[in-house]
Curated annotation (Swiss-Prot):
Protein name per UniProt: Putative uncharacterized protein DDB_G0286915
Native organism: Dictyostelium discoideum (Social amoeba)
Region described as Disordered: 51-78
Top-level division of the source organism's lineage: Eukaryota
Length: 78
């Protein structure tokens, strides 16, 4: 199932775009695949350009609220 999911995302890049928000209500969008693992995606907040990573789970994931992928706390999002 995971392989099918990843292949679908690769063959249809537009389907990888998804608007969401963290627990503070800041809007964001997930964009593209991370270079380290196909199951991770880069996450950019709409509020300040700080990034994080999305875990690729089908029903949501976690967003790192700090600047870049190393800082801040992990937060649930749907």
């Amino acid at each position: 199932m995971t392989i099918v999911y990843c292949l679908t995302k690769l063959s249809n890049p537009s389907s990888s775009l998804r608007s969401s928000s963290d627990v503070s209500g800041n809007q964001g969008v997930e964009i593209d695949f991370d270079s380290n693992s196909i199951s991770w995606k880069k996450w950019y907040s709409g509020g300040g350009g700080s990034g994080g990573k999305w875990d690729g789970g089908g029903s949501g994931g976690k967003w790192n609220g700090g600047g870049g992928s190393g800082g801040g706390s992990w937060k649930k999002w749907n």
